[in-house]
Amino acid sequence: MSPSALDQRVAERTRELENEHLEVLQRLAATAEFRGQEMGEHPRRVGRLSGLIAEQMGLTAEVVDNIRRAAPLHDIGLIGIPDSIMLKQTALSEQEQRIMRTHVTIGARILAGGQSALLQSAERIALSHHERWTGKGYPDGLAGERIPMEARVVGMVDSFEALTHDRPFRPAWSLQKTVAFIGDESGGLFDPTVVSAFLKLRRAGVDLLSSE
């Protein structure tokens, strides 16, 4: 086998192993979210819309693909949250909210140590998707561009998803109300560049709620 053919085979096998690893993690993430209300399609919707926004932002094809594939793992840390909190039908207490917030650090620990750009992106997303542009998020209170770019995208999409679907303690918002809220929070909760890309997709007639 020639050196070039060997290099190609090694690259192919590395990709196969990465895909196998990713599939296991995706199944774990799906298991974590399946305990919640209407959570089965949530990871797929987040992955699809995050990829579309990243593409609209003009990011490279590789980065777009990594975000699309890594985004469904954003809440993998929910696997470590007790059923008593995950399945609660009323608003969480302050103590329960503190426990729920640990899912980001749990998720980052699960994903830590990945050698590929994809898994490293997934780790950053898991840890930082609840950070907010003005620094009022968690776990580290990061602000602006200190928040990893992938997490800024997925954080906005995750918020959009949460608002447009029923939760035990509140009904879903309408699409129109949610889009208006996202627009109003440009430069507030969310990165203005991410919001701009999201609104362009909306104006272009893209189905923002599909998982396909």
Task: Mark where each language-model region is.
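Heptad-repeat alpha-helical coiled-coil signal-transmission segments
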Residues: 3-6, 10-13, 17, 24
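Metal-dependent catalytic cores of enzymes that make or break cyclic nucleotides
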Residues: 19-212
